Amino acid sequence: FEFVILDVLNPNYEKIDSEKLEKLVKENAVALDIRLDNQWKKTGVIKGSFQETAFDINGKFNVYLMDKIRALAGAESQEIELIFISHDGKTAEILGNAFAEDLGFTNVYVLDGGIQSWIDSNKPLEKYN
């Protein structure tokens, strides 16, 4: 059994570092921290970010995530600059691709390395209650 890779598609989202995340948030991008509640409490959260869990502890998708994004973005939700933040960046990449490819969002970003890269860059975090 043999197969040939004809093409490798680049993701429809952009991986960004901590510096670019700070810049985009200052320019009113929506930074959405999609980790679990216990993770927010453990590490804290990025100032200016919004918290909405994407998947529960059992891996079930949060069906209210789109409602949260629409509430934050308003009528032009697909054109907002949307940044996903996860623990290590992997879950954010999955959502980033889905929002860009399947839902038509045009300005999707993922914090490369997730909250851990933010911590490793010695960036400040706020306590989450």
Predicted regions and their residues:
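Rhodanese-like catalytic fold shared by cysteine-dependent sulfurtransferases
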Residues: 1-19, 24-29, 37-83, 87-129
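Active-site flanking residues adjacent to catalytic metal/cofactor-binding acidic residues
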Residues: 32
